[in-house]
Amino acid sequence: MNGNVYLSPTVVQWLLPETVVAAAATLILVLAAFLRGRAAWWWLAGASLAVSALLLAGQTPQAQNLGPVAADSLAIYFRYTTLALGALFLMIFARSVNPAQSGEIVAMLLYMISGTMLVAGSDELVLLFLGLELVSIPTYVLLYLGRHDVASQESAAKYFFLSILSSAVLLYGFSFLYGISGSTQLTTIAETLRARAADQSSWHILGGLALVMIFAGLGFRIAAVPFHFYAPDVYQGTTNGNAALMAVIPKVVGFAALIRVTTLAMPTLETYGWRLALILALLTMTVGNVLALWQDNLRRLFAYSSIANAGYMLIGIAAAFAVNLQTGTPGALNGVDAAVFYLVIYSLATIGTFAVFTWLGSRERPVEHVSDLEGVGRTHPISGIMLAVFMFSLAGIPPLAGFWGKFEVFFAALGVREAQDASVAGLGNWFVFLVIVGALNAAIAAAYYLRLIGVAYFKPARASLKGEGGLAAFTAGVVAAVLTVVIGLAPGPLLNKADAVLTPLDAGQNIPSAEVPAGDQVVQAQP
């Protein structure tokens, strides 16, 4: 692709929200070298998110993609989600980090937010990979800055090397896609694969290899089994704030990329796709939930919780592949919208949980073990209520938001049996089995989530927790708890937004790109 296409006025205007956040990060990083320990960095970061949200509010889904940019409902949904979650993270980190490092930490947070937004709106492999690296590189820095003991440095190094490996595997998968289609633009790749669907040449094998490598590369980011093994050690070796960040942002960016590159750009490879996603969902749910039962370290427990919840989201991806997005049938749309709806619900509950942990502890005495929560429901009643809300939601107990999240992904899987295509409907038994395993996993998960509530309310109180994590972290917990309850009682608005993320335009139709200035057109090789 000619680099000048990124400078066309329409592309620049569409990318302004991401640009504002990245520019603020760069400004803070430069100034922090001369002005140390300034609280102003947090306010400047918050202001950049607010300005970005205002710019985003002026954007609407376009009838055409803008060159390398996907100007669709899915991009807008993910970008709003990222900004909202980013604001909560700023509140959690505000008092829990070393003031001398606040400039660097704020800047890294903003770069991660900008990168996630960039991936969500990418219609081009190079731009998408750039966004992924804009998330990964700041993550290395944050893990290094979080703590300075041996365990922390070991976990940071482990994540660094494995992340590099996953990026290499992902790029290898992208190279196969380029070789098959002759283009790096996702809509062109989808059109090429659709045009060659009846061709029984070796491209199907190459496409299958590309799909496996892309799932492997992105599976690392979403912590799907068997690419999950770094997560428990990395979460345990870092701070509560960093653990929350690791549990949420890589999943948001990972699923945004997975939806873009697989279910939207490679819908004709559903023969491989639904099987691969279904197997990953089964393994990820089961391994995550079973291993979480034996954990005493809270960050390690929520690492396995994060793994298990990635499995539930993969149910939606599997359903989308099974129905095949190019047909535009409701089941396919339900698969993707169920996944993105569940992603928001999971993110709120996880961020809220770590906000409570941050509030209850301090930099010197963080909340780390299950026993640290003993009696919290009596010594810190509001924190106990918030913790109960988040645990009930993660367990999928009505009427909280988590119930609707699980309901949506299970409903999407069962919807495969109702597909108009008889060959697709015949796959329904596999998805019934998937839902049964998912329900059993939900029961297993309830055991360790409800265990935390039992410890908080039915164990003798500990006097060691003073609630010194800062008002901002407490406020983040309250906001997340209120949203979890409100969405649970009235899920309609968020469900409608999730339902709208894939219009017929996005769902595999012939999507032209908006015109860009002469000489700036996408350069495509002949397949």
Regions found by a protein language model. Give the residues of each.
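Alpha-helical transmembrane segments of multi-pass membrane proteins predominantly involved
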Residues: M1-P527
